[in-house]
Amino acid sequence: MSDFSGSGWLAEIFLRYELKRGVTRLTDKQHIGPLMVQRPFYPEQGIAHTYLLHPPGGVVGGDKLLINIDVQPHAHALLTTPGATKFYRSAGGVARQVQTLTVAPNGFLEWLPQENIFFPEAQVRLETHVRIASSSKFISWEIQCLGRPVLNEQFDNGDIRGRLQFYIDDKLTLAESIFIEGSQKQSAVMREFPMVGSLYIYPASDELKAELHESLAVFFSTEVRPLEYGLTDVDGILVLRLLGSQTEPMMACFAHIWQATRQYWLGYCPEPPRIWAT
């Protein structure tokens, strides 16, 4: 675990999942501060579902969250959060969240948190480091919400900087960054939308991509709320990008694609975690 000194608090968690007698078990758990998990449960055969509990009071300037997930060979873990992570107005310090997601050969990690909400005047740095093997399976998403659109609250005078690094067999395969300052959601990145989401799926294939294009067509044939999307294959990683104004349709779209991917890979359609409906 890390040493930290600063004006805010440190919250850190390390979780390791291993396959034991055909069932994925949480075999190592270490935490500091208000980041913790509930005991894994098993709505699906052998797959460990885990709720990561974020600080209930939200995150402010000076706070630091460190999340480390380690999935061992042939283990299969799904993690989500019971609600949004809220980054509040900063009095001068920067809030930081660093996620390190590691998947061993033939492991499977599904990292499916609910959205991040950035309040006006928040100062936030986000880092996600993904390290997987070429034989791993990986699904992850992130949804960033600037301000609170449902209250007509815009993101003003804040500073959000995010970085993603995706390694396959120790080779940097995908690197992305986002920089939003003040009301720059009107930039080319956001196209006037207050929310952006990214879904990452590995491994990609032409057949899976075609299946997901069909699934997106089905979803958007009934979805009337404004969303824009694009699906691309980046060096073997499928990336689905969404722009929108409401959490519910974005989560619904990602969940729909997650189910389609699971159907393609494992031969059945999983039920969404119940916590998403609360």
Curated annotation (Swiss-Prot):
UreD, UreF and UreG form a complex that acts as a GTP-hydrolysis-dependent molecular chaperone, activating the urease apoprotein by helping to assemble the nickel containing metallocenter of UreC. The UreE protein probably delivers the nickel. Induction: The probable operon is induced by urea. It comes from Escherichia coli. It is found in: Cytoplasm. GO terms for molecular function: nickel cation binding. It comes from the Bacteria. It holds the Pfam family UreD. Its main location: cytoplasm. Belongs to the UreD family. InterPro entries: UreD (IPR002669). Required for maturation of urease via the functional incorporation of the urease nickel metallocenter. Keywords: Chaperone, Cytoplasm, Nickel insertion, Plasmid. One of its GO terms (cellular component) is cytoplasm. Disulfide bonds: none annotated. The keyword Chaperone applies. This is Urease accessory protein UreD. The gene is ureD.
